[in-house]
UniProtKB/Swiss-Prot annotation:
Modified residues (2-(S-cysteinyl)pyruvic acid O-phosphothioketal): C128
A molecular function GO annotation: UDP-N-acetylglucosamine 1-carboxyvinyltransferase activity
Annotated Gene Ontology cellular component terms: cytoplasm
Active site (catalytic residues): C128
Family: Belongs to the EPSP synthase family. MurA subfamily.
EC class of the enzyme, as a word: transferase
Organism: Prochlorococcus marinus (strain AS9601)
Gene that this sequence comes from: murA
Binding site for UDP-N-acetyl-alpha-D-glucosamine: R104, D319, I341
Organism phylogeny: Bacteria, Bacillati, Cyanobacteriota, Cyanophyceae, Synechococcales
Task performed by this protein: Cell wall formation. Adds enolpyruvyl to UDP-N-acetylglucosamine.
Protein name per Swiss-Prot or TrEMBL: UDP-N-acetylglucosamine 1-carboxyvinyltransferase
InterPro entries named among the record's database cross-references: Enolpyruvate_Tfrase_dom, Enolpyruvate_Tfrase_sf, MurA_subfamily, RNA3'P_cycl/enolpyr_Trfase_a/b, UDP_GlcNAc_COvinyl_MurA
Keywords, alphabetical: Cell cycle, Cell division, Cell shape, Cell wall biogenesis/degradation, Cytoplasm, Peptidoglycan synthesis, Pyruvate, Transferase
Location relative to the cell: Cytoplasm
Alphabetical list of HAMAP family matching this protein: MurA (MF_00111)
Length: 456
């Protein structure tokens, strides 16, 4: 039987087959941060000069953003993990719905297009189905900067108010430290006239990475990484070469996978202080963490239950709540997981319970009693991070599991199963010739293996 919401239907050509109770051993090369690369791509719209981005991961979300830029007229050339971006050929300021419907980060483009060209039209965004992620903070901030905005038939239409040709600096206080709103408003303010102050700004590393790149381009942004960011608008921005920071969420996912399997691995390159909230909790749960330069090593045996509560950076990241929940299912004792960022990010718990976990869910709080083992089964991921959590569950489970929903996983993890295989996990990506329907799902059968199970 396959479990999950019966309201959804999956008909995909690939799935992962996982043999459980595996161990991890070795070194993991961490990719560039997806959430940073996406906003850096959007920020390239602010200049008329070439941008070179290094350490850009191969992900479907990156491909979607690239297609959005190409549709605007931007010329993109990829050489391995390097992207050369030439925005001098931009010809339109409107984003088509068919390109943005599955990518929430597409909305970042509105701030850049508006401040550079004086107008922009961007459909309301899509992305992971993890609850409401409203854009009111973006809209209110742009209005404060001098934009006139209307929303018609799902399209946000923005232009600079009156006869002015530039946005104007202002003071903005965000109701919550929204990463997306902070990034959108930083881009818009970078070419505005005068000083903009953003209070209660997001402090995430990805925001800091954006500010560092914009400053390389000639922006004047101060105090990124603090609760109040100051931007002095400039007349124009130039080109630059910038290396995307390592993906702290991917790094944390592998650390949690190692802890869940009582394994020892090293991850590199990373920026250790970006992961401090995660490594502190892993240490509290019984793992030994060693930091050396830009690498982190973990050695884990028995895990004990600990409580976590998600919070904006530097707190425990919401994107690692689901993987950490999987870890706690087999921990000694009890634990409590509290999700404070998104209201619909606990879907993985139902599947974990089907595998044999003991979790009671009360709204946004999961109460977990650790069990000795969970059992493999057919699994369906409903979003990016729950997919990673369920794959970790398949690795620690007794027996085999089939994971469906790779369209979610491939949005944010570069070569995930290959990296796991290199660590010793017995996992393969299968391609299917036929399908059958069970419990409301189209399930693949008669699969052809893309790689040998357990091969490095």
């Amino acid at each position: 039987m396959i479990c999950g919401s019966k309201t959804k239907s999956y008909l995909k050509s690939q799935n992962l087959k996982i043999l459980g109770q595996g161990k991890l051993n070795g070194i993991v090369e961490i990719s560039g941060a997806k959430n940073s690369a996406l906003v850096l791509l959007a920020s390239s719209l602010l200049t008329n000069e070439k941008i070179i981005l290094e350490n850009v991961p191969f992900l479907t979300d990156i491909e979607k953003m690239g297609n959005i830029l190409k549709n605007l007229g931007v010329n993109l050339v990829r050489k391995n993990n390097q992207l050369e971006i030439d925005p001098t050929t931009i010809s339109i300021k409107e984003l088509p719905y068919e390109l943005v419907k599955g990518l929430r980060a597409s909305f970042f483009c509105i701030g850049a297009l508006l401040t550079k060209f004086g107008e922009a039209q961007v459909p309301l965004p899509g992305g992971c189905n993890i609850g409401s992620r409203p854009i009111e903070e973006h809209i209110n901030g742009l209005i404060a900067l001098g934009a006139e905005i209307i929303i018609e038939k799902g399209i946000v239409k923005a232009k600079i108010r009156g006869n002015k040709n530039r946005l104007h600096g202002t003071h903005i206080k965000l109701n919550c430290p929204s990463v997306g709103a902070t990034e959108t408003l930083i881009m818009a303010a970078s070419l505005a006239k005068g000083r903009t102050t953003i209070e209660n700004a997001a402090r995430e590393p990805e925001v800091q990475d954006l500010c560092q790149m914009l400053n390389k381009m000639g922006a004047k942004i101060y105090d990124s990484g603090k609760e109040t960011i100051i931007i002095d608008g400039v007349n124009k921005l130039g080109g630059c070469t910038h290396k995307v920071i390592p993906d702290r969420i991917e790094a944390g996912t592998f650390l949690i996978a190692a802890a869940a399997t009582s394994s020892s691995i090293t991850i590199s390159p990373v920026i250790p202080h970006h992961l401090e909230a995660v490594t502190n909790k892993l240490q509290e749960s019984g793992s030994k963490i060693t930091i050396k330069g830009n690498s982190i090593s973990i050695k884990s045996k028995e895990i004990k239950g600990v409580d976590i509560e998600t919070a904006p950076f530097p707190g425990f990241p919401t994107d690692l709540q689901a993987p950490f929940t999987t870890l706690m299912t087999i921990a000694n004792g009890e634990s409590k997981i509290t999700e404070t960022i998104f209201e619909n990010r606990m879907n993985h718990i139902y599947l974990l319970n089907e595998m044999g976990a003991s979790i009671k869910l009360n709204k946004n709080v999961a109460h977990i009693k650790g069990v000795k083992t969970i059992n493999g089964m057919n699994l369906v991921g409903s979003d990016l991070r729950s997919s990673a959590a369920l794959i970790i569950a398949g690795i620690i489970a007794k027996g085999s599991s089939n994971f469906y929903g790779l369209e979610h996983l491939d949005r944010g993890y570069e070569n995930f199963e290959l990296k796991l295989k290199n660590l010793g996990v017995k996992i393969i990506r299968e391609i299917s010739k036929n399908t059958f329907e069970e419990n409301g799902y189209k399930i693949e059968s008669k699969s052809e293996n893309l790689s040998k199970l357990g091969a490095a």
